[in-house]
């Protein structure tokens, strides 16, 4: 049954203040949330958009220790960087605060105390890893070791970043402390737990029966958790950074970040509206919508609702539109590996192109499955869609109006059937876009908005007003009137998606404001209305610009490979006599050329001190022939001849293979006589 609400509270997952925001965050959470909020505002609905930085937790303390600074220094640096980046990118929060604020500390403490006083927690003693050298308990991220699944080194106590498997600290092979490097021991510690099993019955009814409209990925993950049976979850941990547990006997313990962070939505609202914040969180006529990534589904659909229900006075979320993950050039985005497109760097590299990234991220939104961002696709969507379709139509309509009517909107004359069909097409767009936005299908909604521009381009191409200018100006006026009405509709339809471009278009059209209710109308611009000078809405992005971004990623990949380089294991021992069978010599390269129809092969003529011999080597992708002429190389002289591409090769040139697959020919450190033995 359709529920009617007076207002909507929209939250977006609090970004972790231990690094900048990247495109995965934008595609998964912030762009869709901003589209939805802008849409509601255009409809004149009462909406509040809440954001803020999550400033507690282990990764922040780890970074602080690595850099030799305080956790507060870390969060101060990244909170302001993230906030500034969001502002420049057009994420239109009503408030963007932080969980280190006094308001948040007070509200989170009060929330915990109320649940504690109501008997909603249980106390449990458990064993946890302890660093005897550092004299502290180790949280998940303070423990590293070998992953039991893929056997890569450096897996964390909660997850292996190599294979993505969720782990427990005790799963790791050869665990060690990230603080001291020593082997940790198990030690008893006491913590408070939220007994989720106590809430399982009502959660099952509330989610599985009352919210079947949730996205399949959200509904499915919740059902999986519920079917496995919910377990008590710790709400405190041993750490010196965070909100102290506000009860006696809790010295050295803070609220677990998963408990503290979602309360940040409420405290940020209170900071903005100290006198009316409860209306947005406790009134049943308020709709609560959480925008999150899939790694936060359990916290926002099961844990946080259980907290709110246990407290007793808060509303529960009505919808939790969670996205899957966005990958980058076929690889998982990773902060620790620097494999990301960072928002603040994008804003520097592409000034004035916020909407291009918004458009591409929405077009590739991982709404139902993981999706991939590539720089080539970014360029193609800009050049082939924003420039060639949307921008081209707007520019043609505006320029032709300037040329034939001095920039004034011409009156529409008698309409032919094709005019009426075109007007009918774009009048239907409002209902379709609205239907899609209401169910959080932002990718399809944007595609529908772009169809308006396609309609306009086709209409201008079919009617060819430039050919009628000498014979039928009334008809030209009608065509351009209809085209300009389409342009005005585009400005409204794209405002939630491309706010910067819509604002520029509004100024070009000399319109006062936008109203969603006007979308689909064919009289937005009255006859005689003066337009401003047309400008290009979008610019073509050249290959060199994209190649620079791709190279930046390749450099990152190379740096990661070098940092993680590990030599291959030494092979089994051989007898000395077996080694002595190899005759390794130094030869001087006399000639070198590519082997026809063979991408990898070079043909050498080598002076081996006794005669000239031919050797074929698979190093053509690593050296140009002229680089090796005159050089001395090491080769195996007594290898049985072998025919390659019709050429008899009389030996093997020795090369060292780097960790990136590149080859380096083995050469003597100083010149020796051709034929010298390598011993």
UniProtKB/Swiss-Prot annotation:
It comes from the Bacteria. It is found in: Cytoplasm. The keyword Signal does not apply. CDD domains: Anticodon_Ia_Met (cd07957), MetRS_core (cd00814), tRNA_bind_EcMetRS_like (cd02800). Zn(2+) binds at residues 147, 150, 160, 163. It is an enzyme of class 6 (ligase). It holds the Pfam family Anticodon_3. Its main location: cytoplasm. Binds 1 zinc ion per subunit. InterPro entries: aa-tRNA-synth_I_CS (IPR001412), Anticodon_Met (IPR041872), Met-tRNA-synth_bsu_C (IPR004495), Met-tRNA_ligase_1 (IPR023458), Met-tRNA_synth (IPR014758), Methionyl/Leucyl_tRNA_Synth (IPR015413), MetRS_core (IPR033911), MetRS_Zn (IPR029038). Its cofactor is Zn(2+). A motif ('HIGH' region) lies at residues 15-25. One of its GO terms (molecular function) is tRNA binding. It catalyses: tRNA(Met) + L-methionine + ATP = L-methionyl-tRNA(Met) + AMP + diphosphate. One of its GO terms (cellular component) is cytosol. A motif ('KMSKS' region) lies at residues 332-336. Residues 578-679 form the tRNA-binding domain. ATP binds at residue 335. Its EC number is 6.1.1.10. Keywords: Aminoacyl-tRNA synthetase, ATP-binding, Cytoplasm, Ligase, Metal-binding, Nucleotide-binding, Protein biosynthesis, RNA-binding, tRNA-binding, Zinc. Homodimer. Belongs to the class-I aminoacyl-tRNA synthetase family. MetG type 1 subfamily. This is Methionine--tRNA ligase.
């Amino acid at each position: 049954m359709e529920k009617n609400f007076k207002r909507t509270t929209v939250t977006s997952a609090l970004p972790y203040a231990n690094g900048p925001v990247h495109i995965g965050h934008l595609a998964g959470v912030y762009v869709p949330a901003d589209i939805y909020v802008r849409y509601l505002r255009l409809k004149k609905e009462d909406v509040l958009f809440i954001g803020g930085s999550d400033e507690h937790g282990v990764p922040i303390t780890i970074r602080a220790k690595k850099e030799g600074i305080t956790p507060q220094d870390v969060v101060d640096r990244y909170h302001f960087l993230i906030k500034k980046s969001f502002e420049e990118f057009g994420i239109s929060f009503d408030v963007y605060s932080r969980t280190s604020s006094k308001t948040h500390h007070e509200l989170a403490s009060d929330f915990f105390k109320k649940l504690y006083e109501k008997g909603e927690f249980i106390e449990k003693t458990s064993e946890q890893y302890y660093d005897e050298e550092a004299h502290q308990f180790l949280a998940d991220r303070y423990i590293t070791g070998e992953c039991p699944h893929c056997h890569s080194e450096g897996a964390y106590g909660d997850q292996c970043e190599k294979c993505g498997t969720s782990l427990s600290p005790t799963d790791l092979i050869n665990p060690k402390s990230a603080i001291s490097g020593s082997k940790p021991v198990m030690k008893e510690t006491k913590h408070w737990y939220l007994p989720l099993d106590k809430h399982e019955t009502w959660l099952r009814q509330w989610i599985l029966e009352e919210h079947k409209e949730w996205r399949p990925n959200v509904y499915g993950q919740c059902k999986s958790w519920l079917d496995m049976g919910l377990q008590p979850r710790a709400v405190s941990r041993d750490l010196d950074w965070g909100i102290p547990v506000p009860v006696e006997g809790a010295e050295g313990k803070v609220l677990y970040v998963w408990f503290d962070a979602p309360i940040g939505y409420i405290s940020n609202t209170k900071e903005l509206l100290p006198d009316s914040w409860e209306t947005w969180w406790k009134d049943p006529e308020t709709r609560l919508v959480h925008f999150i990534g899939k790694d936060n589904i359990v916290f926002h659909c099961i844990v946080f609702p259980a907290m709110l229900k246990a407290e007793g006075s808060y509303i529960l979320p009505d919808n939790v539109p969670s996205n899957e993950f966005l990958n980058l050039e076929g690889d998982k985005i990773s902060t620790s590996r620097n494999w990301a497109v960072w928002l603040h760097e994008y804003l520097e590299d592409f000034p004035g192109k916020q909407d291009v990234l918004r458009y591409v991220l929405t077009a590739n939104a991982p709404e139902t499955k993981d999706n991939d961002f590539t720089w080539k696709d970014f360029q193609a969507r800009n050049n082939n869609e924003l420039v060639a379709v949307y921008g081209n139509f707007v520019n043609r309509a505006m320029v032709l109006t300037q040329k034939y009517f001095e920039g004034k909107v011409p009156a529409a004359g008698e309409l032919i059937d094709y005019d009426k069909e075109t007007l009918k097409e774009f009048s239907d767009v409002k209902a379709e876009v609205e239907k899609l936005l209401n169910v959080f299908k932002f990718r399809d909604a944007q595609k529908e908005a772009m169809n308006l521009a396609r309609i306009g381009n086709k209409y201008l191409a079919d009617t060819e007003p430039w050919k009628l200018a000498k014979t039928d100006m009334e008809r030209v006026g009608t065509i351009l009137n209809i085209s300009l009405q389409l342009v005005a509709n585009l400005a409204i339809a794209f405002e939630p998606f491309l706010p910067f471009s819509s604002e520029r278009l509004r100024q070009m059209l000399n319109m006062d404001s936008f109203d969603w209710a006007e979308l689909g109308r064919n009289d937005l611009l009255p006859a005689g209305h003066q337009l401003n000078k047309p400008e290009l809405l979008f610019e073509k992005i050249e290959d060199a610009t994209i190649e620079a971004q791709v190279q930046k990623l390749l450099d990152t990949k190379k740096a990661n490979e070098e940092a993680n380089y590990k030599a291959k294991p030494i092979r089994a021992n051989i007898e000395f006599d077996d080694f002595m069978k190899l005759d390794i010599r130094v030869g001087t390269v006399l000639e070198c050329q590519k082997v026809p129809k063979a991408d990898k092969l070079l043909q050498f003529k080598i002076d081996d001190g006794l005669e000239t011999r031919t050797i074929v080597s698979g190093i053509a992708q690593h050296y140009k022939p002229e680089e090796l002429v005159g050089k001395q190389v090491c080769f195996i002289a007594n290898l049985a001849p072998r025919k390659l591409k019709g050429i008899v090769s009389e030996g093997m040139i020795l090369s060292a293979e780097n960790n990136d697959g590149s080859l380096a020919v083995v050469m003597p450190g100083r010149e020796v006589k051709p034929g010298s033995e390598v011993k």
